[in-house]
A protein has these predicted regions:
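Sec-dependent N-terminal signal peptides
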Residues: 4-13
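Sec/Tat signal peptide C-region and signal peptidase I cleavage site
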Residues: 14-18
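Extracellular and organelle-lumenal recognition/adhesion modules and their flexible linkers in secreted
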Residues: 19-213
């Protein structure tokens, strides 16, 4: 039992180190891109509908998934937590479980990543996103991704739709988009337009120009 527990801790430590090394050396714009930061062997972190650290039935109220916050539109309801079930592969210790209760195309649910110190949007610059996602059978919608203002006005500096149906099994998606405006402190956002549950892992965002600054 002890050997198994130590093995889990070692795997999580290796994953966290690799993630930080990628961020430092490879130009990764997403903070905590594989949801391994502060990994623990139990699920104890959950967000409220809009990212506030609310208490949900025994879960710690911290709302802490480093780098990630809620970004729901008015009228949308969703929450996220880390999970250790049905992971992407044996190397991963946990992934993101995003439960969407209320969402429509005109009032989508959203999650956002604030980057390491904000994400710089540079007009005309191309960004390449890769991520893995799977959905439960209830989710019938599409996903939009892009760069958005951190302010309450919700200004989009770049936005595009993820092509293809989100399936029940893990699938990797690659998306590119071009910024239409400048901002030093934008955030990366994923929006969903129907209720259901999504599982997300290995979210990576790169930009040749932005990472040189």
């Amino acid at each position: 039992m002890r050997k198994s527990f130590l093995s889990i801790l070692l795997l999580c430590s290796i994953a966290t180190y690799a993630q930080e090394a990628t961020s430092d050396n490879g130009g990764q714009l997403i903070k905590n891109h594989s949801f391994e930061e502060e990994a623990k062997p139990i699920r104890n972190r959950r967000f409220g509908p809009n990212g506030e650290g609310e208490l949900f039935g025994g879960y710690l109220p911290s709302g802490i998934i480093p780098g990630w916050i809620g970004a729901n539109s008015e009228g949308a309801v969703s929450q996220m937590e880390t999970t250790t079930k049905k992971l992407l592969n044996k190397e991963q210790c946990q992934s993101l479980c995003w439960s969407i209760t209320e969402a429509t195309p005109t009032s989508p649910a959203g999650i956002a990543n604030v980057g390491h110190n904000g994400i710089e949007a540079i007009k005309g610059n191309k960004y390449t996103l890769t991520f893995w996602v799977r959905a439960d059978k209830r989710y019938k919608g599409r996903l939009h991704v892009g760069l958005q203002s951190k302010l309450s006005d919700g200004t989009w500096y770049a936005q595009t739709i993820v092509k293809g149906k989100i399936k029940k099994r893990w699938k990797k998606y690659t998306v590119t988009f071009v910024a239409e405006g400048d901002a030093e402190n934008a955030r990366f956002v994923i929006t969903a337009d129907t209720p259901g549950t999504l599982y997300i892992d290995e979210v990576s965002l790169y930009s040749p120009v932005a990472t040189k600054r």
